[in-house]
Amino acid sequence: MKAVSILSMRIKRGSPHIWVESIATRRAGFEPGVRFSVEMHGSGVLLRVAEDGDRRVSRKIRGESITPVIDINSQSDLAPLSGHESARVVFGDRRIFISPLASELRRRRRLVRLQEHLADGYLETSSIATGGGILSHALHAGFQDAGLYAQSKMCNEIRSDLAEHAMVHNDAFDDQTIMANLPLQELAFDDEVVRRLPEVDIVDLGLPCSGASQAGRSKNKIALPEHHSAVGHLIAPAIALLAKLNPVACVMENVTAYADSASAAILRGYLGDMGYEVHERELLGTEWGELEARRRWFLVAVTKGIPFDFDKLQPGEYPERQLSDVMEHVPLDDSSWSAMQYLKDKEVRDVEAGKGFRMQIYDGSERSIATLTKGIAKRRSTDPFFRH
């Protein structure tokens, strides 16, 4: 290969038209006046220098400069490129190969694979930054409700305790699931491992919110999510792994602030360029029958050509519940009860300092509870507590 470029495709007189004007044309041996043939070759068109070719290289003169030009305007010769706005041109030795963009070929491959899998009644999934696999389980449950079997091909989680717990207790994963228990940034660029990962239909993406959440920014004293030393850069390997998995659709959830991050902007841009349409929505747990008032940002990217409308996602009818309906009975003399005097004292100091931190104390009659954080076991001042 001597050169590669992307050229615009146009319609001229009702047929595809491509104009190749480049010094790379000369490097490939296509000098003005040289004859060449046009052949169908796989997903594209092969131009080959040939003495008996039925086409001839033209020329364009600018002052003393003469540039070879290939001008093809033919429905039959350019049939594989019909309907495309751009084409990839690879210049070789006495040959030029013109084909659809790699992103377009990948989009087509996704759709063909999806049709084949749906015909057999199943889908293949993978999960990135799985955690305990809550999002994976929800997706699989939804597919099952729709009459589709979902097979998890791979899940990636850095924490071994979460990964092993998910493999044992989460029925979204089974013996056919590749457990990639290593950092995402290691997995994405480990050629030996990645080449063994199959392309799938659906990927769920659960990147950590440690840098984007209000608590995370405050704790780590950072201005931007990307400043987080451990997780701020993970959008880069996530995109690299998405490119390998080439899913028909990707589902991501995170704290609402993530939507305004540079990482989210980069992800949107990549998905758009790779042939996806991106849909976003904030959802509140209590509107969907949950007791936890957890508000989250969701991104759903679907391959162009597949309809998707968030407005068709509507809450159902849910029975009214209160916290006491799901609380375990804890004897009043149990050692887990505590006066938490140090937290009460901290609240007094926070009030005096003009800070907004307050304890959240529930008695069980409430119909919702504030977001339960991953560090709730640490008994932090702003996490929910139940009154004795």
Feature roles, as predicted:
Residues 113-246, 256-262:
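Core alpha/beta nucleotide-donor-binding catalytic domains of modification enzymes
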Residues 32, 120, 150, 294, ...:
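Short, well-ordered loop/turn elements at secondary-structure boundaries
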Residues 18-20, 281:
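Short, well-ordered beta-strand segments enriched in hydrophobic/aromatic residues
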Residues 22, 136, 268:
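Short glycine-/small-residue-rich flexible loop motifs, especially phosphate/cofactor-binding loops
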Residues 8-13:
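Beta-strand-rich non-transmembrane domains
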Residues 2-3, 14-16, 23-24, 33-112, ...:
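C-terminal target-recognition/interaction regions appended to catalytic cores
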